[in-house]
Every structure is written in structure tokens, then in C-alpha cells.
């Protein structure tokens, strides 16, 4: 494969002069900051947040780089993974000309971001066992295809994509392959971050929203070769990650062992929930999961979904998603939350039985 990054980047991005702050240009430790029109008198809060945050999130990158055996220059910290997804389209997708390949059923923001950025979406559906259709993906690629998005473990199906299949696509495609690993920490497979130095067109996305339990902070990560990361930094807003979020992430990174225990607990609850869901006659299939949720095929997803809403329990109705007819996606909750879900489903099952008996005797 001949990979030419320069040829993939939009012309306006190549010519872009990124926003530059005086602090970025200053070398050394300044003591007085009169450059950014901040409020030097502070705020009503006890802790001062009157200064802009580190635009490069240096400390976070240094810690994460050590864990992943990469360089800090190979990491981009984003305002949630959705920012990184959007920036990929801005960097590589020429509006009204270029194309992206997605593999439904998959995470919906790939298509939304493509449409916002006027990039045409090509759909190559997963196989019947929710794996990549390599042959059809290759056939869908043409000279306008700039990006391929792969979600692994996949949302909403929950399963890992085969590593060898992903790498075959990465190795043969001259554009950018984005592997979204939002749920990788719940799976037995190691991350593809280890492959970024062997594949210059590979971008791996991760997040602090799932395993780390920090969805409210909106922090995502992109791992890629240094030249791609430079493009992210050129296009991103100058202060895309808040000071509060950066401080919280650094604090969380000190408690990795607690996160590992949480992951183990979620996986244990996942397996227990799967076993209990099998007892219901309206559950026809539970798909294998490498994530913190399960995709459940039912006889009547709409009725079950509405019943649970009445019980004040919200699950995700995937009935109208390609290849997911009759399916609900259920996040693994706490033991108490899962028990409440099961009790509500038992209530529904009892009502179904009573209705059936009444019909038969009537």
C-alpha cells in the first residue's frame, strides 16, 4: 500500500494558519499573564478557574503515553470522541466530493458527522454474525473514499471485530481507517493502539466515558502517527478541554486499579444478566457481548420498550436499526438496577401469561 497523507488532506486545511496564543509562543515559566484578556481578579468560586487551561493537555498525554507505549505526540485529547470524529471529517473530507464507508449497524455519529460535513456515506453492512464484510468493503472503495469507520467492540451489537480483518483493511486502504474502541476495556482483546506505528493510516479512538465512568467530563482520545495528530491540533479549537475536566482526569488516572475492579464488576454483572434474560419467553436471542451492554432480540421490542418506560426504566430501542429488528440494547447497570429491570420484565411476563390464559379460556 502506498500511503500519501498529504494527498488526503483538504487543501484549505493544508493552507490553514492555526490559532496561536502568546503562551504557546512563550518559552519558560511566566509569572504574570496579561495576554488573553482573562479576569485577573478571579471568580466567585473557591477554586480559581479564571485562567484558560493547557491547550495541549500535556500532563494527561504524558501519563497515557506511558501506559500505551506511545509518544505523547501520538495522542490527541478531545472534547469527547465525537469531537475527534468531527475533526476527521473536517481534515480529510472534501464537502460534496469525498466519501466515507461505515458498516451498519454501527454508532450513529459517524453518519451524522458525515452529513454535517457534506461527506457522502457509503454503507457496507456487517455479515449475519456482525463481522466486517471485507470483500464488499474493498468493492465499495473508489478514488473518492477518504475514510472508513470501524467500531470494535461494535455499538449496538456489542461484539469485537476480528483483528485480522481490521488489519487487512488498514493494510490495503490508501485512506484513513478509524477504529473506535470506546468499549475495548470490557473485552479480552488488546487495543489496536499498538499498531499505529506499523500502519500510518490508522487512527484509534478511545474514551473516558465508559470504563472510566466519566461521561460527564466529555474526554476522548485519538491515537495515531504524529503527522495525523499535528493535523488534529491544527484544526481543533484552542482550548477544547476544560480545566475542570483536565484536573478530574489526572485525579482519575491515579486510581487505575479501582477502574480495573469496576470493569471486572461490570463484566460479572453482564454475564449474570445474560443468564437471567434467557429465562423470558419473549427473549429469542442474546448476542455475544464484549462491551458494557447486551443486544437482546425479542418478540416485540416496541411493547417491551414502552412497558419499561412506564416502569421508569429506560433502555435503547434498536428495533428500527438495520439488522437489529426486534432488538433492545440494555446497558449493564448496578446489581440493584439489573434486579429492578428483571423484576419489571417478570411483571410483563406475568401479564402476558394472564392475557394468554384469559384468551384461551374465553
Q: Which residues fall in each region the model found?
A:
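N-terminal "arm"/small-domain region of PLP-dependent enzymes with the aminotransferase-like
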Residues: 1-59, 63-66
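Phosphate-binding glycine-rich loop
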Residues: 57-99, 117, 298
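Conserved PLP-anchoring active-site segment centered on the Schiff-base-forming lysine
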Residues: 91-113, 127
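Short beta->alpha connector loops at strand-helix junctions that form conserved
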Residues: 104, 120-128, 206, 318-319
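Active-site phosphate-binding strand-loop segment of PLP-dependent enzymes
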Residues: 128-187
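PLP-dependent enzyme catalytic core of the Aspartate aminotransferase-like
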Residues: 164, 310-311, 320-353, 358-362
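PLP-dependent aminotransferase class I/II
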Residues: 201-279, 286
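Conserved PLP-binding catalytic core of the aspartate aminotransferase-like
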Residues: 266-267, 279-311
Amino acid at each position: 500500500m502506498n500511503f500519501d497523507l498529504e494527498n488526503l488532506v483538504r487543501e484549505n486545511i493544508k493552507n490553514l494558519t492555526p490559532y496561536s496564543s502568546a503562551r504557546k509562543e512563550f518559552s519558560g515559566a511566566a509569572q504574570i499573564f496579561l495576554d488573553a484578556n482573562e479576569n485577573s481578579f478571579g471568580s466567585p468560586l473557591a477554586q480559581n478557574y479564571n485562567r484558560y487551561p493547557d491547550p495541549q493537555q500535556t500532563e494527561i498525554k504524558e501519563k497515557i503515553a506511558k501506559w500505551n507505549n506511545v509518544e505523547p505526540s501520538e495522542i490527541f485529547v478531545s472534547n469527547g470522541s465525537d469531537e475527534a470524529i468531527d475533526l476527521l471529517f473536517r481534515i480529510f473530507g472534501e464537502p460534496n466530493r469525498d466519501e466515507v464507508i461505515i458498516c451498519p449497524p454501527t454508532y450513529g455519529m459517524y453518519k451524522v458527522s458525515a452529513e454535517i460535513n457534506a461527506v457522502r456515506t457509503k454503507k457496507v453492512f456487517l455479515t449475519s454474525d456482525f463481522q466486517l464484510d471485507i470483500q464488499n468493503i474493498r468493492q465499495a472503495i473508489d478514488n473518492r473514499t477518504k475514510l472508513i469507520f470501524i467500531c470494535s467492540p461494535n455499538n449496538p451489537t456489542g461484539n469485537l471485530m476480528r483483528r485480522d480483518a481490521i488489519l487487512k483493511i488498514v493494510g490495503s486502504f490508501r485512506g484513513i481507517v478509524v477504529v473506535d474502541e470506546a468499549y475495548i476495556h470490557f473485552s479480552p482483546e488488546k487495543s489496536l493502539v499498538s499498531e499505529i506505528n506499523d500502519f500510518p493510516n490508522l487512527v484509534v479512538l478511545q474514551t473516558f466515558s465508559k470504563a472510566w465512568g466519566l461521561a460527564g467530563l466529555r474526554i476522548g482520545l485519538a491515537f495515531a502517527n504524529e503527522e495525523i495528530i499535528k493535523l488534529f491540533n491544527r484544526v481543533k479549537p484552542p482550548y477544547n478541554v476544560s480545566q475542570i475536566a483536565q484536573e478530574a482526569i489526572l485525579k482519575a488516572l491515579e486510581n487505575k486499579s479501582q477502574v480495573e475492579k469496576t470493569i471486572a464488576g461490570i463484566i460479572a454483572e453482564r454475564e449474570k444478566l445474560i443468564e437471567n434474560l434467557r429465562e423470558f419467553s419473549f427473549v429469542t436471542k442474546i448476542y455475544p457481548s464484549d462491551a458494557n451492554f447486551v443486544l437482546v432480540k425479542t418478540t416485540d421490542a416496541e411493547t417491551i420498550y414502552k412497558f419499561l418506560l412506564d416502569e421508569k426504566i429506560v433502555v435503547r430501542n434498536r428495533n428500527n436499526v438495520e439488522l437489529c429488528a426486534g432488538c433492545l440494547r440494555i446497558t449493564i447497570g448496578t446489581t440493584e438496577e439489573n434486579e429492578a429491570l428483571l423484576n419489571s420484565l417478570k411483571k410483563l411476563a406475568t401479564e402476558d401469561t394472564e392475557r394468554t390464559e384469559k384468551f384461551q379460556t374465553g
